[in-house]
Structures are given as C-alpha cells and as structure tokens.
Amino acid sequence: MKILRKNHPLLKIINHSFIDLPAPSNISSWWNFGSLLGVCLMIQILTGLFLAMHYTSDTTTAFSSVAHICRDVNYGWLIRYLHANGASMFFICLFIHVGRGIYYGSYVLSETWNIGIILFLTTMATAFVGYVLPWGQMSFWGATVITNLLSAIPYIGNTLVEWIWGGFSVDKATLTRFFAFHFILPFIITAFVLVHLLFLHETGSNNPSGLNSDSDKIPFHPYYTIKDLLGILFLLMALMILALFFPDILGDPDNYTPANPLNTPAHIKPEWYFLFAYAILRSIPNKLGGVLALLLSIIILAAFPLLNTSKQHGLIFRPVTQTIYWIFIANLLVLTWIGGQPVEYPFTMIGQIASVIYFATIIVLMPVSNTIENNIIKL
C-alpha cells in the first residue's frame, strides 16, 4: 500500500498533499480553519445539490418551492437549515482564517494570499446571489439595492445594471441567472482552492513563531489529520446546534414574507457577514465613492504584502502592531454592528469614524508601527 501510495500517478498527488506533506511541528489550532473551510465547502455543495433538486427559479414559485422543501421533502427542513447556517459557519471560518493570516504574517506568501483574496471575493459573490434565491422581501430588495450600485459606474452603469437584471427591474430573468451563478460558483471556488493549495505547498506553511521551520518538519498524517478531525467535530457540533436549535437566529424575519416590489422593508440589510462592508458603503454620501470603498474594503487585503516593512515575521513578538491589530478587529465588530442599524444619528457618525479607522489601520498605522519596531530592534 505504501509503494502504491507513493508511485500511483493519482494517489501520489494526494500523498504529497495530505499524507507525507512536511508540516511545521509547532502549528497551532489557528491553522485548522483551512481544513474547516474545505469541509464547509463540501457541506454547502452537497446540501445545495439536494436543494437544487426541489427548487424552482421562477418568481411565482420560488418562495413556495422553499416552503415545499421544508414541509414535504424528507429532511428538507434540515437540508435547508444546514445550507443557510452552513454559510454562516463558512464565513466565521473565513474571517478567522484571514485574521490568522494577518496576525502571523502569512501574507508574505503573496501568491497564496492573493488567490485567497480572489476566493474571498468569489465566496461573497456566491453568498449574495444565494441570498436572493428564496425570493423573500429581503432577498428581492437586497438584490435591487446591491445590483443598483453598479449604476454608479460612469457611462456604462445603467446599461450594465439592466444587462444584469435581464430587464428594467429585478424579475424572473434575474432570479434564473442568479440561480445559475449560485450553482456554478462553488465549483469555481473549488478550482481556486486547488490553486491556493498548490501555491501553499510550493512554499510550505507558515508557523506561529514566524521562523524558518525547514529543520523541524513532521508528516501531515497522522499528526495534523487527527488535529483537523477534532476541529471538524467541533465545527459539525456547532453547525448542528445552530441548525437544530436556533435555525433562524442569523436570518432576517422579513425573508419569511414573499417578495413584493410595491412594499419596501423599513431597513434593507444583507446577511450578517456582509454588514461590515455594507457599513463602509453607507458611510460615504457619494454613490460611486461608496461602491469604491466597498470594493476596497476587501481588495485592500492585497496591500498587506506590499506595505509590510517589518524585519520580524508575524506579530507574536511585536506588541505595538499587536495592539493595532486588536483595534482593527474591534473596529471590524463595530462596523458589523453599525451595518445592521438604521441610517440615522449617531449610527451614521460612528460608521464614518469606524470606516476611517478600518482603512487607516491598514494603510497608515501598521506600516508606521513596523518602522517603530524596526528601530527598537536596532537599539
């Protein structure tokens, strides 16, 4: 079996990626979230496949087809809630994975990092088009508001919006194409994941100390397969508790009302994992400026490898940047809270301050603290 594992053309790839892969001996549980994201992706594809068997992407029957899945399909309610809450678990793991990458300086592996940003954007796009499919009030108005942002693009904006809608408003054509996008994008994500792993295995993984670990490697199996399995058990336990006991806690009550173009909800807001970006979008009074800020809130992650001037790897021995990092995380939570609040004083003011802090920590404070710490080392 050992000979076959190492010589067979297909098994050899799996062996070098998951069995005999040399891994640093000191990587902590923060490194588990990559494998957890893989599990989340598999859960989403499988539950999504079963949902697609019963869902109809037509404006007249979409809402009732989701109700039919929950009421008449065997364990349809469970599949639906696993899929909906699986998306939340996916984004929790994604945020922690990116946060760990920033804290431990994983962005120095720039190819892996940049593919990760593309993955982040693609996952956000997938979640957005997926949220439209149940055709509830928030689905319809969320789709209308977010797609309408493209009209801010000079010259081609209005044409582009009508092209995406497939008409002059969000309607049957929009729902059908969003369903098509939602079905194909997870497979594109899977392809990008393989590229992400390819680049990661070219350079080897980072580790908490930030030091070169070439002299101290251990095989991935059994050490990290067991560790990942423990993480997967915790993930599945959290997902099942969420889906079985609190299935609607992260959803919006408005989405249990069928879409009505003549009745606008009091507060249009996206799912919780988009609220930080939505708060940044709303904090800028100009439409085009808001759209650019929204895009920059994610794309700015690509600036980390470019702005990194530190002589040390990661933040483990850098108290100044550590403090700024935790300010950044706290600020992100504030933005998430503000994104779910109505557009009125003092929320607008807090949102604007938090948006400035968000960009300032990445562009100004972290590079400045890098320079300060480099000078301290010289003393």
Swiss-Prot record:
Pfam families in the record: Cytochrom_B_C, Cytochrome_B
Residues at which heme b b566 binds: 97, 196
Which stretches are transmembrane?
A: 33-53, 77-98, 113-133, 178-198, 226-246, 288-308, 320-340, 347-367
Keywords noted in UniProt: Electron transport, Heme, Iron, Membrane, Metal-binding, Mitochondrion, Mitochondrion inner membrane, Respiratory chain, Transmembrane, Transmembrane helix, Transport, Ubiquinone
Q: Which GO terms describe its cellular component?
A: mitochondrial inner membrane; respiratory chain complex III
Q: Does the keyword Zinc-finger apply?
A: no
Q: Where in the cell is it found?
A: Mitochondrion inner membrane
Against InterPro entries, the record matches this protein to: Cyt_b/b6_C, Cyt_b/b6_C_sf, Cyt_b/b6_N, Cytb/b6-like_sf, Cytochrome_b, Cytochrome_b_C_euk/bac, Cytochrome_b_N_euk/bac, Di-haem_cyt_TM
GO terms (molecular function) for this protein are: metal ion binding; ubiquinol-cytochrome-c reductase activity
One of the GO biological process terms: mitochondrial electron transport, ubiquinol to cytochrome c
Q: How does it sit in the membrane?
A: Multi-pass membrane protein
Residues annotated for a ubiquinone binding in this entry: 201
- Cite the cofactor comment: Binds 2 heme b groups non-covalently.
| Binding annotation for heme b b562 | 83, 182
For this chain, the family text in UniProt reads: Belongs to the cytochrome b family.
Assembly, per entry: The cytochrome bc1 complex contains 11 subunits: 3 respiratory subunits (MT-CYB, CYC1 and UQCRFS1), 2 core proteins (UQCRC1 and UQCRC2) and 6 low-molecular weight proteins (UQCRH/QCR6, UQCRB/QCR7, UQCRQ/QCR8, UQCR10/QCR9, UQCR11/QCR10 and a cleavage product of UQCRFS1). This cytochrome bc1 complex then forms a dimer.
Could you share any additional remarks the record makes about this protein?
Heme 1 (or BL or b562) is low-potential and absorbs at about 562 nm, and heme 2 (or BH or b566) is high-potential and absorbs at about 566 nm.
Q: What does this protein do?
A: Component of the ubiquinol-cytochrome c reductase complex (complex III or cytochrome b-c1 complex) that is part of the mitochondrial respiratory chain. The b-c1 complex mediates electron transfer from ubiquinol to cytochrome c. Contributes to the generation of a proton gradient across the mitochondrial membrane that is then used for ATP synthesis.
Its recorded name reads: Cytochrome b
